[in-house]
Amino acid sequence: MAVPKRRKSRSNTRHRRSQWKAAAPDLVPIVVDGERRLVPRPLVRYFQQG
């Protein structure tokens, strides 16, 4: 039979959550319609296709 995990205190939960940071995407310069733009690397292909 399944056993519930130990409950974490509110303080521990909030300290753990506060350590999480979103990383900014690395932007690469590309030229679109003669204009230089900074776009996230995964989207470069779509910008070049049109």
Curated annotation (Swiss-Prot):
NCBIfam families in the cross-refs: rpmF_bact (TIGR01031)
Disulfide cross-links: none
Keyword Ribosomal protein tagged: yes
GO cellular component: large ribosomal subunit
Region span, Disordered: 1-21
Cross-referenced SUPFAM superfamilies: Zn-binding ribosomal proteins (SSF57829)
Pfam families: Ribosomal_L32p
UniProt KW keywords: Ribonucleoprotein, Ribosomal protein
UniProt feature, compositional bias: Basic residues: 1-19
Native source species: Saccharopolyspora erythraea (strain ATCC 11635 / DSM 40517 / JCM 4748 / NBRC 13426 / NCIMB 8594 / NRRL 2338)
Protein's recorded name: Large ribosomal subunit protein bL32A
